[in-house]
Amino acid sequence: MPQPLKQSLDQSRWLREAEKHLRELENLVDSNLEEEKLKPQLSMGEDVQSPGIGEPLHPNVRAPLSHVVRAATIDLPRLGNKLPAKHHLGKLSGLYQMKGCTFNPEWKVPDISDTHFDLQVINECPSRNWKYLTPAKFWPKSISYFPVQAGVKAKYPDNVMQHEAIVGKYLNRLYEAGILYKRISKHLVTFKGKPYNWELQYLVKQHQVPDGTTTSKINGRAENRRRRAPAKSISRPHDSERDCNMVGQISNNRSSIRPCANNGGGKHYATTRRLACWGGKTIGTDQSYSSRDTSATVDSRGRSESSRGFSTISGRKATGNHHHCSNVTNSVETTTRGRSTPGKQVVTRDSSALPESRASRACHKDSSPQKEENAWYLRGNTSWPNRITGKLFLVDKNSRNTTEARLVVDFSQFSKGKNAMRFPRYWSPNLSTLRRILPVGMPRISLDLSQAFYHLPLNPASSSRLAVSDGQHVYYFRKAPMGVGLSPFLLHLFTTALGSEIARRFNIWTFTYMDDFLLCHPNARHLNSISHAVCSFLQELGIRINFDKTTPSPVNDIRFLGYQIDQKFMKIEESRWKELRTVIKKIKIGAWYDWKCIQRFVGHLNFVLPFTKGNIEMLKPMYAAITNKVNFSFSSAYRTLLYKLTMGVCKLAIRPKSSVPLPRVATDATPTHGAISHITGGSAVFAFSKVRDIHIQELLMVCLAKIMIKPRCILSDSTFVCHKRYQTLPWHFAMLAKQLLSPIQLYFVPSKYNPADGPSRHKPPDWTALTYTPLSKAIYIPHRLCGT
């Protein structure tokens, strides 16, 4: 072939080939797929696209990809109607045809620990994110409430009672870990674990007296709720009056003493406290609280196995003196994590002189009712409905662990339907961004948070909107649940704040995505020691690390976000490719597949598509079937195209070198003529077969220049062409154009400076005054990730 656009050479042969390719491109543009869209088939049992005689069982992939693409533009796939079709494609099935969960009566509830991060993290890791997390707020505009009896979904009709029993155990385990509130009444809930600062003002001293009256005290105001009997005077003159203040302990269900918040600062106020002991004796004590007194210390580490009673006073006559007790709601000292050690009792300094045997007998006598250990009562700034907003069911923890159960919480009413909410967006790296931020040639360590969502506390009023039940008790999420669309955004804020501080404090490259941390440093030994320091730093703040999923030592090859990452490249595991090729081989030509089955297939193809030589336009026929919810039929050429994509596996370089080549070819078009100009001075003018929209004529000339000259970049004065978004064009032409122009750069040049503007109007080209710019949008990368 003669050199293109050289005036000194005979370009008749070159022009003939260019004219031929231009007519082929025009035919693709003029052939419209609309006639083929949604054409119903004659009968479901008939293969309307039966394979020809001698059709090979496996796709022929020897031809180059460009030839396969051209063949797919001739032998087109088809869209069908909405009649029933095949629901299985290899091992894939429609979303409603997923393998049903099998109930396991031996399911074990996994160990769930108390995840309570220290609010000191706000000072240790300065960030504006904490104002959205301490506490997090969830305010739906409207809510649909369901009865308590509908709390557990009827996922297993043959094992309803067993299913509800295991769900009840699971919810109780979450309650014991401080993740749930348990409903007591319309205005009262109880929880376990260490209270947060914003919960202190709502804590209640809740205790029961023998006449059936339940007394709640919040912020110094007492409130009596009568059960049955009228009020009685139960203070006996011969009972001694002592102060028995306990911090963080509860003796009986609804029979507890709790120090509450004192909004009055240093004011003293007197109340009469009544203690209920199941032996029938009660003690009335006159107290004066002062927030200036010493604070009680609580070790809230383990659970108490032995039953605890309040330390009651002896039968000696009271002196009538008022004993000052500390108000501890604003100054509770606790250990880093956990609960009180078994057997310990926390009493005031004045009651330490009492005989322990006599003190314990009074409350341990006839202590048959169930006791709540280490619980707090809270009366939030909201009402606690005796209804639920989400439903529950259990599944296997994962495909490899079927002995443990996983709790699935369905709060889908907040993401779809009339109660749907618009959740905030947040920066999430795509593959292109990940390639540009990962450092090259550094050892890496990955960390994984344990129970990541359960680190995020909710405002008590927001918790009342997230109600679940096992059919007996109503629980509210005190920490963020996984079934709400707001939770990933909150987790992103949480890990981003931690990652920024880790990078600043330890001077290493840190990247966070959801509950995953990636640490990089040039020195492997230094990175190893730093990773231990990072784990200690996080654990001191009450943030739990899942060491089972954490890299024990620095490695060069790591699996992160589903990708296999080595020192210089990113790739996908070979097993994923083999599974996808197997699925494509099992496609039956001409058979009709249900659109939900195609939806799952497209999801798998999208994950591997960046690692192939294909583009998203190749999947548009399947997207059309999914959008219109109709059946889809593969053609032989289209199946070959998909198989060819999975054969052309490539690995992507980390930190690819960006080059800005100098433009040497320019194109321009009018409704009737198109021109290609070369920097050497040669040019060629072509006449279109018909008048079309100008953006299509411009794209035709750019594609022709790519086919005939194969430049590294092309100048064009069409923004439509430079942006490379061709969704509005017929599919086969859009696919070919995207395939041709993806590898090269397109620069925008104003029409007055376009060198090809003259030849398209039968004037000489002008390359003297050239002004151009790329229109591709720069990839957003956070500032802290740009430096390395």
UniProtKB/Swiss-Prot annotation:
GO terms for molecular function: DNA binding; DNA-directed DNA polymerase activity; metal ion binding; RNA-directed DNA polymerase activity; RNA-DNA hybrid ribonuclease activity. Activated by host HSP70 and HSP40 in vitro to be able to bind the epsilon loop of the pgRNA. Because deletion of the RNase H region renders the protein partly chaperone-independent, the chaperones may be needed indirectly to relieve occlusion of the RNA-binding site by this domain. The record marks 96 as: Priming of reverse-transcription by covalently linking the first nucleotide of the (-)DNA. Its EC number is 2.7.7.7, 2.7.7.49, 3.1.26.4. It comes from the Viruses. Residues 656-788 are annotated as: RnaseH domain (RH). Residues 201-365 are annotated as: Spacer. It catalyses: DNA(n) + a 2'-deoxyribonucleoside 5'-triphosphate = DNA(n+1) + diphosphate; Endonucleolytic cleavage to 5'-phosphomonoester. Residues 363-373 have a biased composition (Basic and acidic residues). Residues 1-200 are annotated as: Terminal protein domain (TP). Residues 376-565 form the Reverse transcriptase domain. GO terms for biological process: DNA replication. Keywords: DNA replication, DNA-binding, DNA-directed DNA polymerase, Endonuclease, Hydrolase, Magnesium, Metal-binding, Multifunctional enzyme, Nuclease, Nucleotidyltransferase, RNA-directed DNA polymerase, Transferase. Multifunctional enzyme that converts the viral RNA genome into dsDNA in viral cytoplasmic capsids. This enzyme displays a DNA polymerase activity that can copy either DNA or RNA templates, and a ribonuclease H (RNase H) activity that cleaves the RNA strand of RNA-DNA heteroduplexes in a partially processive 3'- to 5'-endonucleasic mode. Neo-synthesized pregenomic RNA (pgRNA) are encapsidated together with the P protein, and reverse-transcribed inside the nucleocapsid. Terminal protein domain (TP) is hepadnavirus-specific. Spacer domain is highly variable and separates the TP and RT domains. Polymerase/reverse-transcriptase domain (RT) and ribonuclease H domain (RH) are similar to retrovirus reverse transcriptase/RNase H. This is Protein P. The gene is P.
